[in-house]
Amino acid sequence: MQLMSYRTEGGIRIQREISNQPYRPADNALAGALDTRRGVLFSSSFEFPGRYTRWDLGFVDPPVVFTARGRRFMVDALNQRGRILLDPIAETVSALAATTVEKNSANRISGEIEETKERFPEEHRSRQPSVFSVLRALAHLFASSEDQHLGFYGAFGYDLVFQFEPMQLRLPRPDDQRDLVLFLPDEILIVDHMRQSAAIHRYEFEVAGTSTSGLPRATPHDPYRLNRAAATRPSESDHGPGEYAALVERARAAFARGDLFEVVVGQLFAEACGDLPSVVFQRLRQANPAPYGALINLGQGEFLVAASPEMYVRVEGRRIETCPISGTIARGRDPVEDAERIRELLNSTKDESELTMCTDVDRNDKSRVAIPGSVRVIGRRQIELYSRLIHTVDHVEGMLAEPFDALDGFLSHAWAVTVTGAPKLWAIRFIEEQERSSRRWYGGAIGRITFDGNMNTGLTLRTIRMQDGVAEVRAGATLLYDSDPEAEEAETRLKAAAMFTAIRGPVSAAACMSFTAAVGCGRKVLLIDHEDSFVHTLANYIRTTGAEVVTMRPQLARSELRHGANPDLVVLSPGPGRPADFNMTGTLELMVERHIPVFGVCLGLQGIVEYFGGSLDLLDIPMHGKP
């Protein structure tokens, strides 16, 4: 056990205790607890050198939650421990300009951010009054370089962009929509899969002589609720067949006018789900490992289950980085087909154009807050392999200029071009005009802002929103003038497919087999080996049908056939040289005489052709090993 104590910039004294835990079951137990208790589990189950490692961290029963919708915000104490923190929080927020604050009860303060009438240069857009002003003030209240894990954890909704870029909204917003839910924990489980270690960090807070020490950590339960009426709800989308393709055509018209260069438009899929969020999360994590996996109990019966492949913004010290993803193709059935798909993706000029444009916009986002000359691409069109998809990814970094911080970097990218488009402001307007429903959390971010000034967030993609027995998945495609409407509609459905596999339950391995194992059962195959380097691979392929396969060199095979061997099939293997080098004519005479079916591969086929009167010639360029 390790103990330490420190004082934050806002004068709060914090005592931290670190205790080691058993490695294996740690995160599984936490996932189950989240079915009934508010909190977060972030899980990175994907590795990429210099970018991602495997870890889990999370908690339940946070003492404080910060929520916002539009320009209104609330800070709630969820237990007596949180009430101790509410007074310094209220004092800090009340000192902000353009902010009205009231303490509604011993457990809640609320307020509203006034829209600014001040003019400002674009470089300072991230400093206009918004709910992020409150978040920045609270981060300063708890700020300290002594700890790298304490901070705000949760979800950032898509509509937060309208505090950065205000505009007229067309789509109605659901009454229960929230734009921001962030928890302040007092106990964090941290699992390092590289080191195979786990530990719990526990925090006690002292404010003006009053401490949380000894107070219970529990908070009221907020379980997942199943709605019986939802159990019979059919699968549905907010676009009918062909309607998304028609939307693509409208986007192409905007490209032709020069209104847009690219835009990411999505459709929403929904269906009943009777399983608990933790069950769906475990299935999704197993089937679709990702660097930004998450299970979040947001409270009010709302859950997010995520397997996001894309970093949104990560800040460590003054370094800010992003990893834009654009360019997608389905995985192959095996590594050989994967290689073919990767080649196809890398040779696609459309996909290259998509990613180039995304990265150009991303570099522009950083340039608003970065030291001149520090923004650079450190990885170009790198391949990342996921369960069903292959992506091309760029890696971009910069150095934050003074006085900007991680929140400035976060806001300057709102939202990533890979979920909006370019020019970004016009793309966001197009999305508001053309999509059928509010995005809620989709296209926003999940992650944490730690009080040491760092940040790690992933884009809210490949994410299931669960509430009242209904699971929702939103998926989009990056549209360009060259887009094929039907192909783009198919891409959105492909992206959603992995999510619905987790929602509906696992598919058995037998159902995924591309052949019927019984077709060769009871059959005997003689494979004649012409000194080839691939004969045993060929034999194994045949055995997968259930057939019994025996491999022999030509002389032994002919001897066995003369002495009564009676296979159901003889396979003549590939090999070097010419058929005459192996007396293939003598072998085939026995086949014809005995009426035994024969199948030839490469050299074997050549021997059959010659035996029945055909002729062979040499190619100008040998083709062995070429596709």
Language model: regions and residue ranges:
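Extended alpha-helical targeting/anchoring segments
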Residues: 1-522
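Conserved acidic segment of CheY-like receiver
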Residues: 524-529
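Short phosphate-binding/catalytic loops that engage adenosine nucleotides
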Residues: 259, 547, 596
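A short, well-structured beta->alpha microelement
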Residues: 23-25, 544-561
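Cysteine-nucleophile active-site neighborhood
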Residues: 564-627
